């Protein structure tokens, strides 16, 4: 069976000997919903960073839909959509520019990118803000923009790091339905 995500004996030791991860094993089947829960400093963001290849692991292996993250990084990353904890888009670009540009990074044709932008921005109630600069959005709208951006190449696996941070109760409810 090919899993959506396979972590095998995953370890991470930072400089100074701080061990963030110690032998993590996890198999996630396609279609499953998982949450990493734990206190601050438990290694949740480190794990997400390794899965998304933003943080180097110290040991173990990561496979995304069968692709080894070390040996087949391009194929593995094409399967992933990441919504990071921090907003990391150009605040001077418009909402539409941000999502269409993201699709382009993955080779999505401009016409298709425009269609996907309308689809995801509408689903996330941002279509009416498509021509606004990202810096003008509220925190909750920025969070939804990050989700729309992560969906633009239609990944098979969506990774969300603190997806409801700074989001009001009503939006949290709508995000999970």
Tell where the protein language model's regions lie, with residue ranges:
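Conserved ABC ATPase signature
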Residues: 133-137
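Hydrophobic anchor residue at the start of the ABC signature
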Residues: 147
């Amino acid at each position: 069976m090919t899993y959506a995500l396979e972590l095998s004996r995953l370890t991470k030791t930072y400089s100074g000997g701080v061990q963030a991860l110690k032998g993590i094993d996890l198999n996630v089947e396609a279609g499953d919903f998982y949450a990493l829960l734990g206190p601050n400093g438990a290694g949740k963001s480190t794990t997400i960073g390794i899965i998304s290849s933003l943080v180097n692991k110290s040991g173990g292996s990561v496979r995304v839909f069968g692709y080894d993250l070390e040996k087949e990084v391009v194929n593995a990353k094409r399967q992933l959509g990441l919504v990071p904890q921090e907003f990391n888009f150009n605040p001077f670009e418009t909402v539409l520019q941000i999502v269409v540009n993201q699709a382009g990074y993955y080779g999505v044709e401009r016409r298709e990118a425009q269609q996907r932008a309308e689809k995801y921005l509408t689903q996330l109630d941002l279509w009416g803000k498509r021509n606004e600069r990202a810096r003008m959005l509220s925190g909750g709208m920025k969070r939804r923009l990050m989700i729309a951006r992560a969906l633009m190449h239609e990944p098979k696996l969506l990774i969300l790091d603190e997806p409801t941070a700074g989001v009001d109760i009503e939006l949290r409810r709508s995000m999970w339905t």
